């Protein structure tokens, strides 16, 4: 009962934060599409609320490049990000990622050329790359594998939520066209980026490194959840292709690792990842 109450507190308080971060990441990644189009044409031949294409003198092809350049760094930095998070913990790393992409998103409103937009999008991909694997890692500190599926599906709803109202939000923000001499599309980036920065600052105080440092849990709940995490949940013979030796895994509940499983050196983990066929199957489905 105590353990269930503790997991319920995590579910009610931590998962909504994960959903919000994922929602903001998705909005900040995709709101450039809302900034593309011009407003209505005026009788004098000018355009009311010009879009980013007109403001930066970009062609549709150049704009498609701006959409694409985000993904190379987005894909490449996911693995390094999760190696970093193991060293410094989710409490610092996840809010830092959100703070970084929030700043980059805000600065996107200041770009004055297509080259500047390309560079901004590259750094946006770099900053957002670690969020999904980072949140997934954080959830593994609280839930056993059979419980993760629903929790992951829950925070992935952030993408669906963003699609339901991000367009309406961008349309409303673009009505600020002309205020302080800024175009409407610039205000979209300013407001949404600043809001992400504000949420990131709050997250420094509410995202834990694991059960041991989770403020919403009592000492007994923390110990029960940690004990539950490291109870056997599958047999070694169920995972022969991973070539994981049980003797290489140990449990050391210290203040540094928050009671996480200490696995073999990171390069062995990386090697096992690259030879796991499920990684490639999942990647194909995602593509």
Q: Where do the protein language model's features map onto the residues?
A:
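Helix-breaking motifs and short loop linkers at transmembrane-helix boundaries and internal kinks
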Residues: 28, 57, 88-89, 110-115, ...
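Single conserved hydrophobic/aromatic residue that forms the stacking wall/gate
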Residues: 1-7, 11
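Membrane-interface helix termini in secondary transporters
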Residues: 51, 82-83, 172
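Central mid-sequence intracellular linker of multi-pass
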Residues: 8, 145-159, 174, 178-272
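Residue-level signature of mid-helix packing/kink "hotspots" within the transmembrane helices
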Residues: 71-79, 129, 164
